[in-house]
Amino acid sequence: MRNLYLSVAVLVLATLSVSYQSCVSDVSANAVTPAKADPTEVIWHEIEDLANLQSKQQKPVIIDVYTNWCKWCKVMDEKTFSDSDLAEYLNDNFHMIKLDAETKSDITYADQTFSYIKSGRRGYHELALALCRGSLSYPSLVVLDEDNSILQVVRGYKDAAELRVLTVRS
């Protein structure tokens, strides 16, 4: 009887071991495979990465200055930036940057540190104010040349066709 229990225990342990190995290999197979960027979605970067991006490949830059509460910023994300043809065009021709105009983190850009300024109920980030040339309006798209000089600030909602026309002229 003791041998029977021992045999059953060994069989159960062997089965559990095989099942565990199968699960671990499935998980590690998924973990090793990096997700590739979908070329039909805009590839967004942080502004802190801009110098590194420009050192690898110089391109004009579009900075989407937004806030979390801005309805039209969300509509642009859902409709304009989700247009697959526009996304592919923007990814090919621009470094795309997202900047929350109310982020509370200090940001170092162009060897200068910018901070959050508490003002009223919300406040604003100094970098957003500087990029938007002193006039905050959401959404705002700031277009920079390859040397990161401001070419233009485009304020308000733009659909995919309008944005395509604006970026072709830049």
PLM features per residue range, with description:
Residues 46-49, 81-82, 127:
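N-terminal post-signal-peptidase region of extra-cytosolic proteins
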Residues 74-78:
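Detector for the c-type heme attachment site
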Residues 1-31:
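Bacterial Sec-dependent N-terminal signal peptides
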Residues 84-87, 91-152, 169:
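Thioredoxin-like thiol-disulfide oxidoreductase module
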Residues 157-159:
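A short acidic/small-residue loop/turn micro-motif
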Residues 42-61:
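A short beta-strand-turn-helix
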Residues 23-41, 126:
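N-proximal helix/coil linker or "cap" segments that precede and/or mark the start of modular domains
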Residues 57-71, 96:
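Short active-site neighborhood of thiol/selenol oxidoreductases, capturing the structured segment around
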